[in-house]
């Protein structure tokens, strides 16, 4: 039997059974589209992700220790999506969202939908309904660890219910994945870290909610606080490191560092200076920073203040950095070295 005729017959049968478009050639011109992205609020992280930001129509996981900047990063993504006219929602399972801080990061509270569900099932049902609507561009679930199953809430404190949350997440993600892709909605799950008992070799760290999220996520970001930023004796922010642990859309394992300033969020000006020095756009001589023979200031903080007062020079540096994104990405990959986080498994 001729293979071409057999294939045509099979394709016709599939289309009769499941509708036109249920199977197609991947290279058909009208079907191939670029993946839409949402900027993260961090220029270096956008470059490290390889596609200019976080992908729409995919699941993203942001995890790390307490007070490392997980929610801050998610709120920056919401603010960037809103700037582009997107509709965003925030499922606050932890009941801990600070609207004043969110506004300072640039979030438009008037157009942000928020839900504070009582149970994990309720949170995931609301998530599914919003995703299926096709009207939401970015949806954040904060956090997976706070998605408490109804059986656990109704039970006694001492009840042992092993694997209940993992089963809940596994079922929810099976249902959500196709809807997320069809609606082109990005769902960001914020997750916490736990320690595995009795681990002799490798990292004892793991994330909550079982393994399903590791499989379904297209991008996984490990965010850590690596130091403090001081203004004289007062701590005014955190030095933060983000590692792209998994990336289905570009090479993973790139690592970036940026500042998170209390009450302001990610310091864009600090990134412009750091990345500029790496690529050679900003010159550093001793403690002095300069750009195109124009002195920016002595010391990093003075250089940041100069860029704050001269927005046109900051815009010039940002444009030059975006034009050198490929070079920066290679450097970020080299800087990541061979450090492993949670085995760096790409699942």
From Swiss-Prot:
This is Protein RecA. ATP binds at residues 64-71. GO terms for cellular component: cytosol. NCBIfam families: tigrfam_recA. Keywords: ATP-binding, Cytoplasm, DNA damage, DNA recombination, DNA repair, DNA-binding, Nucleotide-binding, SOS response. Its main location: cytoplasm. One of its GO terms (molecular function) is ATP hydrolysis activity. It is found in: Cytoplasm. Can catalyze the hydrolysis of ATP in the presence of single-stranded DNA, the ATP-dependent uptake of single-stranded DNA by duplex DNA, and the ATP-dependent hybridization of homologous single-stranded DNAs. It interacts with LexA causing its activation and leading to its autocatalytic cleavage. CDD domains: RecA (cd00983). It comes from Bartonella tribocorum (strain CIP 105476 / IBS 506). InterPro entries: AAA+_ATPase, DNA_recomb/repair_RecA, DNA_recomb/repair_RecA_CS, P-loop_NTPase, RecA-like_C, RecA-like_N, RecA_ATP-bd, RecA_C_sf. It comes from the Bacteria. The keyword DNA repair applies. GO terms for biological process: DNA recombination; DNA repair; SOS response. Belongs to the RecA family.
């Amino acid at each position: 039997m001729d293979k071409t005729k057999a294939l045509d017959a099979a394709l016709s049968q599939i289309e009769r059974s499941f509708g036109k478009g249920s199977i197609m050639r991947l290279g058909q011109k009208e079907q191939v589209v670029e993946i839409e992205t949402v900027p993260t609020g961090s220029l270096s992280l956008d470059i490290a992700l390889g596609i200019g930001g976080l992908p729409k129509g995919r699941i993203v996981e942001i995890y790390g220790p307490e007070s490392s900047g997980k929610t801050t990063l998610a709120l920056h993504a919401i603010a960037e999506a809103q700037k582009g006219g997107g509709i965003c929602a925030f499922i606050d399972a932890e009941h801990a969202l600070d609207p004043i801080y969110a506004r300072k990061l640039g979030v438009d509270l008037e157009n942000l939908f928020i839900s504070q569900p009582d149970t994990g099932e309720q949170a995931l049902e609301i998530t599914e309904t919003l995703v299926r609507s096709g009207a939401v561009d970015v949806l954040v679930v904060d956090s997976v660890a706070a998605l408490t199953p109804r059986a656990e809430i109704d039970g006694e404190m001492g009840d042992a219910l092993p694997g209940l949350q993992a089963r809940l997440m596994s079922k929810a993600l099976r249902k959500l994945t196709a809807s997320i892709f069809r609606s082109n909605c990005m769902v960001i799950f914020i997750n916490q870290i736990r320690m595995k008992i009795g681990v002799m070799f490798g990292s004892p760290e793991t994330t909550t909610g079982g393994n399903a999220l590791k499989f379904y996520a297209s991008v996984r970001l490990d965010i850590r606080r690596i130091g403090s930023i001081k203004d004289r004796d007062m701590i005014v922010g955190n030095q933060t490191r983000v590692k792209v642990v998994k990336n289905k859309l570009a090479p993973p394992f790139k690592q970036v560092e940026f500042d998170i300033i209390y009450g302001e969020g990610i310091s864009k000006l600090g990134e412009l200076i750091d990345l500029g020095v790496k690529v050679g756009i900003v010159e550093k001589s001793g403690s002095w920073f300069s750009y195109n023979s124009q002195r920016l200031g002595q010391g990093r903080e003075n250089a940041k203040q100069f860029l704050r007062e001269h927005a046109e020079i900051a815009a010039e540096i940002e444009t030059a950095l975006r034009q050198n994104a490929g070079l920066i990405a290679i450097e970020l990959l080299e800087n990541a070295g061979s450090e492993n986080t949670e085995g760096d498994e790409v699942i």
